[in-house]
Amino acid sequence: FIDLGLNVVEDNASKREWLGANNLICTLPSSEGKEHVSKIYFTSHMDTVVPGINVKPILKEDGYVYSDGTTVLGADDKAGIAALLEMIQTINEQELPHGQIQFIITVGEEAGLKGAKELDQNLIDAEFGYAVDASQAVGTTVVGAPTQMIINTTIYGKTAHASKPNQGISAIHIAAKAINKMHLGQIDQDTTANIGKFYGGSATNIVADKVILEGEARSHNDKSLEYQINHMKETFETTAKELGGKANVEISKIYPGFRRNDSETVTQYAIKSAKTLGLSGKTVIAGGGSDGSIINTYHIPTVILGVGYEHIHTTSERIPVAALNQLTSQLIKIVELVAK
């Protein structure tokens, strides 16, 4: 970004022990005569899921870029960054008129949007913007996402030798009973819930006195989400009490939901840029969060642009070169439309 002539500032996100680097805020000043147009931003994240070290990208005859199969490709979200860099290069080479553009390159997105949560808001100077980080096809815009809550539960029983089970209280038994009572899966059209991790115990000949369960619920409806989380919490607690044990339940919000209208300026530029290029221009509601979920809470309207990568978070991840070209063209078109 510095080599392309941008002013680059690092925030202090790495002060948090779970982040190994800072976020970058890179600013491309407006071209002459375009100081009055809306200031916008784009964001992509620089981290990937594991295994993501020593990635060896391979362009195959089908037009897709793959890894060698031993790592993820990391197109989520290196593809977003690549398209942003190519856009800047094109703007510079072709001297395209443009307003001020910021590029927010975050850390820790895959760890729970932690970089965006630690982002220094005082460094952001934009009226609206775009997260370049959706698995949808290029030309599709994500205009909404759910709120996600995590529910972590520790269940305590009483240890005993397995040959004398009546002298103990099995934490595993309590957990199994609670899960059996619990409403999980697709709760309603807006809400899902899941218990994803369950571990504990020390040996087959010991009644387990402690187990830990990690779960989540997410919803586009805050009331439905609150009801579901309370249902899960109360089910753990009442079941444990009925069977002589105890449940310690911890609940935390990972990211808030958001919903942007198709008529909003930020969405209109995404739709128009896509349709101008012959792309779908459709808008969708996503089932997961992104850095855009967090930046929307900073009162900066944000939607998420489809990047076109496929099979993310697996060693089969791939992206067509055509999608990268289309994405770059859409980013440039957004800048051009805003500058008119």
Predicted ranges, named:
Residues 1-35:
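A non-catalytic alpha/beta surface segment that caps or lines the substrate-entry region
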Residues 14, 46-48, 104-112, 134-136, ...:
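Acidic, glycine-rich active-site loops and adjacent beta-strand->loop/helix elements
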Residues 20, 27, 34-105, 126, ...:
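Active-site metal-coordination/substrate-binding segment of hydrolases
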Residues 49-63, 141-154, 272, 303:
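Acidic-glycine-rich active-site phosphate/pyrophosphate-binding loop
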Residues 59-72, 156-159, 277, 309-313:
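Glycine/charged-rich beta-loop-alpha catalytic/anionic-binding loops adjacent to active sites
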Residues 66-75, 159-163, 201, 319:
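A short glycine/serine-rich beta->alpha loop
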Residues 71-148, 193, 204-205, 213-216, ...:
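Acidic/histidine-rich catalytic neighborhood of metal-dependent amide-processing enzymes
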Residues 171-340:
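Metal-dependent amide/peptide-bond hydrolase catalytic core
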